[in-house]
């Protein structure tokens, strides 16, 4: 498993921004295609966010709001209400393991290992 504290080639701000964006997209769309290393690191980020969302108190809302982007989809769905009203209730009986990583063939351009990460 990838080291969660490892920073790729960039600084910590770049690293945080990439995983904020990936986590927001995963919550909104349910699955995304990315590199295998990013998927492994994203798994721990998203699972912590969903665990906090299951608490459904003010402190959890503020912590998640400070991390996720407040964007909407084309259908007008906002991230925060969707996470607290649709995603978190699905996992009330589950104590972790909210995501699944499925390996797919390598990318043609640079032969990077690719994966699809999805909410179970």
Swiss-Prot record:
**What PROSITE patterns does its record include?**
RIBOSOMAL_L17
Q: Which InterPro entries match?
A: Ribosomal_bL17, Ribosomal_bL17_CS, Ribosomal_bL17_sf
Which residue stretches, if any, does this entry annotate as coiled coil?
none
Q: Name one GO molecular function term.
A: structural constituent of ribosome
Which BP terms in the Gene Ontology apply to this protein? Answer: translation
Q: Which domain of life is it from?
A: Bacteria
Which Gene Ontology cellular component terms are annotated?
cytosolic large ribosomal subunit
Q: Which UniProt keywords apply?
A: Ribonucleoprotein, Ribosomal protein
Entry-linked PANTHER family: LARGE RIBOSOMAL SUBUNIT PROTEIN BL17M, RIBOSOMAL PROTEIN L17
The UniProt entry's sequence similarity note says:
Belongs to the bacterial ribosomal protein bL17 family.
The UniProt subunit note reads as follows:
Part of the 50S ribosomal subunit. Contacts protein L32.
- Protein name as it appears in the record: Large ribosomal subunit protein bL17
From the broadest rank down, the organism's phylogenetic lineage runs:
Bacteria, Bacillati, Mycoplasmatota, Mycoplasmoidales, Metamycoplasmataceae
Q: Which gene encodes it?
A: rplQ
């Amino acid at each position: 498993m990838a080291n969660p504290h490892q920073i790729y080639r960039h600084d910590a701000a770049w690293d945080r921004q990439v995983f904020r964006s990936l986590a927001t997209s995963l919550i909104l769309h349910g699955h995304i295609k990315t590199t295998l290393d990013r998927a492994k690191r994203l798994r721990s980020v998203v699972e912590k966010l969903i665990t906090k969302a299951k608490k459904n108190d003010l402190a959890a809302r503020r912590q998640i709001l400070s991390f996720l982007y407040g964007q909407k989809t084309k259908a007008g769905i906002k991230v925060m209400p969707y996470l607290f009203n649709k995603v978190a209730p699905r996992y009330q009986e589950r104590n972790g393991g909210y995501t699944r990583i499925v390996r797919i063939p390598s990318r043609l351009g640079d032969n990077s290992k690719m994966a699809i990460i999805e909410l179970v």
